[in-house]
């Protein structure tokens, strides 16, 4: 892991200093000017270090239900997974956390799909998911869809995620331009 290589050249060695990160979390949603109802959900779980937003789609009942279900499932799966890290060697944590986040998104997707199959009034519901899990001195991003994660530093915003959309795929392939 080149990011952790210090002057000794030893992979995985930690620098002698510790970064100090000030985390400010807030959450708010707004229906905007076009829609009649809000389909967003968010989660701020400081005890776990998990922060996420889910932007529902598929009509008010469906989108709101999907985003709320996603936030709940991801929180529960991540909490269970992180509890299992305790007995694992620290050098395996990065991969384990990535697997936990992937499993949480997959589980949320499966549950939303199953719910939509059982209740026809929810047919077509879905949600985006963008979140971050802080553990130790690292942040791990989970991302599905076109809600974006940004890093704010020195008054500047840097986009950390790429949209999972047909349009973005076409732009990345050079078939379309952003204009």
Predicted features along the sequence, with ranges:
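Intrinsic-disorder-associated, low-complexity terminal segments enriched in Asp/Asn/His/Tyr and depleted
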Residues: 1-4, 17
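PP2C/PPM-type serine/threonine phosphatase catalytic domain
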Residues: 9-179
């Amino acid at each position: 892991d080149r990011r952790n290589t210090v002057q000794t050249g030893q992979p995985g060695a930690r620098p002698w200093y510790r970064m100090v990160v000030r985390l400010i979390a807030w959450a708010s949603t707004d229906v905007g000017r076009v829609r009649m109802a809000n389909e967003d959900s968010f989660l701020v779980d400081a005890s776990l270090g998990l922060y996420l937003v889910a932007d529902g789609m598929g009509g008010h009942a469906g989108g709101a239900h999907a985003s709320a279900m996603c936030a709940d499932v991801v929180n529960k799966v991540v909490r269970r997974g992180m509890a299992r890290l305790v007995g694992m060697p620290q050098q395996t944590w990065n991969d384990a956390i990535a697997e936990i986040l992937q499993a949480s998104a997959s589980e949320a997707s499966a549950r939303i799909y199953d719910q939509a199959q059982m209740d026809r009034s929810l047919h077509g519901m879905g949600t985006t998911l963008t979140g971050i899990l802080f553990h130790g001195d690292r942040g791990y991003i989970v991302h599905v869809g076109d809600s974006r994660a940004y890093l704010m530093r020195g008054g500047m915003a840097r986009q950390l995620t790429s949209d999972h959309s047909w349009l973005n795929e076409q732009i990345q392939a050079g078939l379309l331009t952003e204009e």
